[in-house]
Structure formats: C-alpha cells, structure tokens
C-alpha cells in the first residue's frame, strides 16, 4: 500500500473479475461505463480515481444528506429527517457509519460550507445550505490496468462491459474552449481589497476565486476522458450526485486516514505555469523555487496544516515528511509538502477531516479570519468548489480530495472556477494570471454535449 492509500477492507459482497485487455485505457473505460451504465438511465453515480484504480459507485442504495439545518437519510424511497446541532462531522460521521454497517465503501462530496461551523460562522449560511451528500452504492465497478472487478453487479453492467471491450469506447470529438480573460466579478479589485486588509493586520492570507461561465452544455464523461489525458492529478473524479454534475482533477489531498490510523495531508501553495516547452517550464520552476512570495505563501500554509493535524494526532507523531518539492499538475506546477501523523485514539476520521477543513490552501490563515473574508469578498456560497470528494471505507479509512480544477453543472448552468492565494506581497494582475493558468487545466478540453 502506498503512503496515501486508503484500505478498502475485506469484500463482503458478491464479486467477479474480468481481465483487462491490453491497450485499454482504464480511465477511458471507467468514464464510458459511467456514461453507459448510469447516465443513460439518469442514475446518480460517482467515479473516483485513487492510486491507479477507478472506482465507479453506481446507483444509490441509501443516501445521507446533511444540510445546515437538517440531516436526512433516504432509503427505499423513505426519507427520515432530524435536526442536528454541534459538529457537522459528528452528525455526518454517525449517519455514514450506519451506512457502512451494510457495505464496504461509501462515496460522496463535502461542501466548503461544511467547514465554517468550526470557526463559529454557521450563522452566515442561508437556510438549507447543502453541507454533504454521501451514499452507499448499489453496484461498484473497479477498473485498473490489470482487471475489472464487479461488486453486486447486474446483467446490464456485465453486458455494458462486454460491449465496450468488444467494440471499444467512443472516439472523443473535437473540444471547444471558453474565454477566461474577462473579469466580470471584479477579481482584481477584490484582490486589492484583500491585500489592504492583510496589510492592516486582519489576516495573513486568503484564497479568492472567480467563476467562468461555460456557454454550452458539456458532455461530462467525454470531457473527463480528454482532460485526464492531459492532467496529472493526485485524485480525479466524475459525478452526478445530489443535484450537481462535476468532474475534476484534484491537485491535493485534504485528508487521507488509513485503517491503521495514519493521517496524511498534502498542502500545495505556490504556482507557476507548466506545459509551455522544456526551457520555459524550467525557468518557471526555478522562479517558483526561489520566489519569496511563493515560498512565504507555501511555508505559512504548511505551518498551519501542521498545527491543525496536531490537534487530532497522537502527541509527537505529527511531522513534515516532504517539504516544498515541486508537484506537476497538468497546466501548472506547485510547491507541495506532505504532513503525516497518527490519529489519536480519542479522535476519528471525521475529526481529522474537520481539523483540516476547509483546506488551508483554499481558505486562509488564520482560517477563521480567512473564511470570514471569503464570505465578504468571494462569490459565495462555494458549494462543492474547494470542498472535497470523498471515499470512506468500513475499516475506518477516509480519502478526501480537494475539489479544484473542476467543471460544474447545476440545472442549466455550467461553469468553471479557480482561485489564488493572496498575501501582502500579492499583485492583482499576477493573481488573475494565476487563475487563468489553473483554468487551463480544463479550458482546452471541454467537449460539448451532442
């Protein structure tokens, strides 16, 4: 098991295996299965890439919906509602643990707003604000370079796989792009306000973001396939769940909790463009590794993450095991670090998630002041953006990927979103340019829905 793996526990459901034919791309096959098996019947699903394996969780057996003012558990068409108070992680964790009494894995997403309760900002949320959606699937299909494994799969799932292996996946048509150069939300102006507030001592860092509207409907599975070929994410995902469609190439882990109690977080902060040719990329990397603004931004993010993980760790177990190395993520390169600890016996995976959520690299420092500034200066609510896509296992494991470099669709609206970390040395024009670089993870690879 790799350092960042989350064990899935022993399989207790009916399973079968199909050898993976040579030359078949597992990401392509998994995304096409999502299109054929789930989207064709308008069924909720989540596809999650983790450590060389794509897990397609198809169909909802039971769903946990956590809102700011209510918890709902939906099973067999029956919805049970209850009010909750205190920590959202405790409320969500208890409900998810019940799901995991009957299955090995659960999947879902956690909104940015899930993290505001820890900082006393829950009164800033509108009624019925979605905080999390987690479900146990009817069927799981795990795709890797070696094999395809099916759990509780029906005839139509097996037939879909046989058909795709026999005929091949669809060709990806020509992509379309969108213009990211406009600034209708006044991002540069908002950055300037944040710089003034930082200079006045209100906080040290804040991540501000901007949305880019996509003026056409996109084919999410095809876009995922095309974009995945050009990205090197730590995790990736494709989903239709809880009223939202999304796909993304996550650059970092918010939290990974292993069954043996090891906790990992991987803050990335500090950015330069990538993919402009070897010589230009080398110059950008050298600048990234020597630029005082980027180094300061990264160092204070690592310090904050280390303090947060210490809150839920066994005393003396928290350590930075990899500091400020360059991580390549598609169209950009980042300074990244890895922090590891051992979960204290008095804590659990939800306590670990809450301690590190929202990610310091998507909120601010100090985090309470940064989140408060986001409520005032950013386009809110953020929802899934800068939240997490999660996979949980019955053995206590958790894998939570930061939701960035993603496309979203709710109703008839499709959009992208990207942000930048603002510190006192920030320049509005450079921060705007950084959002353009991050948006380039997706903008060349948008496939219109036919």
Curated annotation (Swiss-Prot):
Keyword flag Metal-binding: yes
Residues where substrate binds: 270-271, 385, 405, 419-421, 438
Disulphide-bonded residues: none
Active site, per annotation: 252 (proton donor)
Gene Ontology biological process terms in this record: catechol-containing siderophore biosynthetic process; cellular response to iron ion starvation; iron acquisition from host; L-tryptophan biosynthetic process; salicylic acid biosynthetic process
Keywords: Isomerase, Lyase, Magnesium, Metal-binding
The protein's annotated pathway: Siderophore biosynthesis; mycobactin biosynthesis
E.C. number: 5.4.99.5, 4.2.99.21, 5.4.4.2
Reaction(s) the record says it catalyses: chorismate = isochorismate; isochorismate = salicylate + pyruvate; chorismate = prephenate
Residue numbers binding Mg(2+): 297, 431, 434
Family: Belongs to the anthranilate synthase component I family. Salicylate synthase subfamily.
Subunit structure and binding partners: Monomer.
Protein name (database record): Salicylate synthase
Species this protein is from: Mycobacterium tuberculosis (strain ATCC 25618 / H37Rv)
